[in-house]
Amino acid sequence: QVKIWNRTKSKADALVGAGASLVDAPSDLANVDVLFTMVSTGKDLRQVYFGDVGVMSGDNTPKILVECSSISAPESAEFRQTAIDRGAEYLACPVSGNGKCVKAGKLSAVASGDKNTFDTVREIIECYAMRGVSYVGEGELSRFCKIAHNVLLGVYIQNLAEITILAQAAGVPRHAFLEFINNSVMGSIFSQYKTPALVNLDWTTTFTPPLLRKDLDLGLQAARELGVSMPVTAATREALQSHFGSASLKDDPEGYLAADFSALIETVALQAGIKLVSENKDVK
């Protein structure tokens, strides 16, 4: 039996159509055997767990909590300890991929916590993380893996935008340049996946600049705490901030920042004095 809750009820329609039961509040899930959570921030997760109608607002707690959000290691450690104090098991298991990856069966996950807990829920995780789930050890180690993953995401998209605009400034069409990159040893699944957006300026949201900024900040915070120098990440964070400045010039700044993070290329182009237009190319 699968029970679900979503802050935006309409987003649960597909699962309800597949047979899941939609509950009215997180507190209605307090008695389940295994609870999976995925929200945007640690603040959101705290509300889901401990708010007035939170999962742990009453006396009951799910037997196993599998937490899949991108949050900091200290926040995760706090939630883990609370779960343990209430007699529950807690597995940190963030994922890599967006909605399109899920539909294509290409989502992956990374897990940390008690190995027996992981073994108990692994087959359930693999139902959605079809590319596999990597167990990396105890505690919050998976949080550091996900933070590092999203730091790479930010550095990659920023540099991809920069070199694409560099090529365009020299006279190379974006679609031609990205075709070359994708066919080269430097191409990747990600560059191929983002090519249609960068060529045709399609900012259908998969991941937003505010969420990327949050994750870069988490990465830099972890770097300070662990004594690791990350100058490229710091520069990427500053470059990203300029996109927020560009957004303030838009008619709908909030709406613009809710668009996909690949729109960063518009800020790079603006700084180069280039006005982007869609190339209207059927690129894969």
Task: Describe the predicted segments one by one.
Residues 1-38, 63-64, 78, 99-102, ...:
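NAD(P)+-binding Rossmann beta1-loop-alpha1 motif at the extreme N-terminus of oxidoreductases
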Residues 278-284:
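Eukaryotic N-terminal low-complexity, Ser/Thr- and Lys/Arg-rich leader segments
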Residues 48, 69-151:
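Rossmann-fold dinucleotide-binding core
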Residues 2, 22, 89-91, 174, ...:
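Hydrophobic beta-strand scaffold residues
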Residues 140-267:
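Helical "substrate-binding/catalytic lid" subdomain
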Residues 22, 26-91:
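Rossmann-fold NAD(P) dinucleotide-binding segment
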